[in-house]
């Protein structure tokens, strides 16, 4: 039986968006951590950004090792929060293409639902342009797979998704956001080392590959690390200002209490 709805907390939504917008050449993916209530509503509290072992323009996959690591992280969060946290879904990006899941996505989702009927899939379609306004858009959807009435194939069923606002970003989501630049850097290093280890490459090709590697790292610093650092600094300044305002409010209330 399909879930009735998905409630995605805004700080987890922020991490998903940052991850999806980190690259427009290949798809990215991650896992959703949360819980399912008695009304079959999936509550997503945080996400885990996965490291891609194979970069493809139109496909991403989850390895068993990554699922195991995510399950361990969910257990840690359950102990930390005292709530029944577990892996409740996965998300991936669709750069430059439609938000609707492909046949591969639907089959992959069906495979996960064999292990957990409450498992959901999220897709973030980015780097697309509205033809009328000529402005960029980001679309997102949530889906599950159901057996088609005719044949052995699966078809998607759209699940209502609601973004639940939060005044502040949670610790776990903040850690995931900070982890993103490191994971992207590791992916670039893995790709470079794999190519650089080939013995038949001539010196000019190796120099070219090194230049491409450096260029990609600089692009990541400009597009991901720089804006993330600026956002964290702005958030820190906002928190400091809030502390000052709360201290002034405390002093005012203390003075009023003393005059009573």
Curated annotation (Swiss-Prot):
This enzyme's EC code(s): 3.4.19.-
Pfam families, alphabetized: BRCC36_C, JAB
Class in the EC hierarchy, top level: hydrolase
GO molecular function: cysteine-type deubiquitinase activity; metal ion binding; metal-dependent deubiquitinase activity; metallopeptidase activity; polyubiquitin modification-dependent protein binding
Keyword Amino-acid biosynthesis: no
Binding residues annotated for Zn(2+), in chain numbering: 92, 94, 105
Compartments, as annotated in UniProt: Nucleus; Cytoplasm; Cytoplasm, Cytoskeleton, Spindle pole
GO cellular component: BRCA1-A complex; BRISC complex; cytoplasm; nucleus; spindle pole
Transmembrane regions: none
Primary location group: nucleus
InterPro entries the UniProt entry points to: BRCC36_C (IPR040749), JAMM/MPN+_dom (IPR000555), JAMM_MPN+_peptidase_M67A (IPR050242), MPN (IPR037518), MPN_BRCC36 (IPR033860)
Residue ranges annotated for the MPN domain, each copy included: 6-149
Superkingdom classification of source: Eukaryota
Cofactor(s) required for function per UniProt: Zn(2+)
GO biological process: cell division; DNA repair-dependent chromatin remodeling; double-strand break repair; mitotic G2 DNA damage checkpoint signaling; positive regulation of DNA repair; positive regulation of NLRP3 inflammasome complex assembly; protein K63-linked deubiquitination; proteolysis
Entry keywords, A to Z: Cell cycle, Cell division, Chromatin regulator, Cytoplasm, Cytoskeleton, DNA damage, DNA repair, Hydrolase, Metal-binding, Metalloprotease, Mitosis, Nucleus, Protease, Ubl conjugation pathway, Zinc
Motif (JAMM motif): 92-105
Quaternary organization: Component of the BRCA1-A complex, at least composed of brca1, bard1, uimc1/rap80, abraxas1, brcc3/brcc36, babam2 and babam1/nba1. In the BRCA1-A complex, interacts directly with abraxas1 and babam2. Component of the BRISC complex, at least composed of abraxas2, brcc3/brcc36, babam2 and babam1/nba1. Within the complex, interacts directly with abraxas2. Both the BRCA1-A complex and the BRISC complex bind polyubiquitin.
Entry similarity comment: Belongs to the peptidase M67A family. BRCC36 subfamily.
The protein's name: Lys-63-specific deubiquitinase BRCC36
Originating organism: Salmo salar
Lineage summary: Eukaryota, Metazoa, Chordata, Craniata, Vertebrata
